[in-house]
A protein has these predicted regions:
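Metal-dependent phosphoesterases centered on the DNase I-like endonuclease/exonuclease/phosphatase
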Residues: 16-101, 105
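N-terminal low-complexity segments that are often proline-rich with Ser/Thr-Pro
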Residues: 1-15
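Surface polyanion/phosphate-binding segment centered on an Asp-His-Pro turn
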Residues: 122-141
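Hydrophobic alpha-helical positions that pack around
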Residues: 109
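Short helix-loop capping/hinge motifs at secondary-structure junctions, enriched
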Residues: 114-117
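Short, solvent-exposed helix-loop connector elements
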Residues: 90-91, 119-125
């Protein structure tokens, strides 16, 4: 498992990490999880059009996630829930969590070879205590 947290140099960091992940994948399947601080597509945030130029939803950040997927990693939540609009982060401002104005910026990506083992991918948005909520996957071997 490789955990990441990406910030301003998202694209460059993700490219270097992607090279590492692809080399690691030559030896064993890979699970990548963490706070990517970026929503991938419109379904991954409550107000996509209002946020198109904002950090966390720039073209470069979205392309970074697309590159990860194109390299053969599966977005586990979106794979199992293609149309579900759930979020893993809400701003502390303006009652965002109460009004469910959130973003899905926390991810589990897995190697394609693990797809057959993926049983569940969940966002536990009922769990309070942070601006993020827990996410989980279940793999059965």
């Amino acid at each position: 498992m490789f955990q990441t947290q990406c910030h301003a140099q998202f694209q460059q960091q993700l490219f270097v990490q992607l090279l590492f992940l692809k080399s690691l994948e030559q030896q064993k399947p890979v699970v990548v999880c963490g706070d990517f601080n970026a929503a991938h597509t419109e379904i991954d945030l409550a107000r996509p059009h209002q946020n198109e130029q904002n950090a966390g939803y720039t073209v470069e950040e979205r392309q970074g996630i697309t590159n990860l997927i194109n390299a053969g990693f599966i977005d586990t939540f979106r794979f199992l829930h293609p149309d579900e609009q759930k979020y893993s982060w809400w701003s502390y401002r303006g009652g965002a969590r109460i009004n469910n104005i959130g973003w899905r910026i926390d991810y589990f990506f897995i190697s394609e070879s693990l797809q057959k083992n993926l049983v569940s991918a969940e966002i536990h948005d009922d769990v309070q205590g942070s601006d993020h909520c827990p996410i989980s996957i279940r793999l059965e071997f």
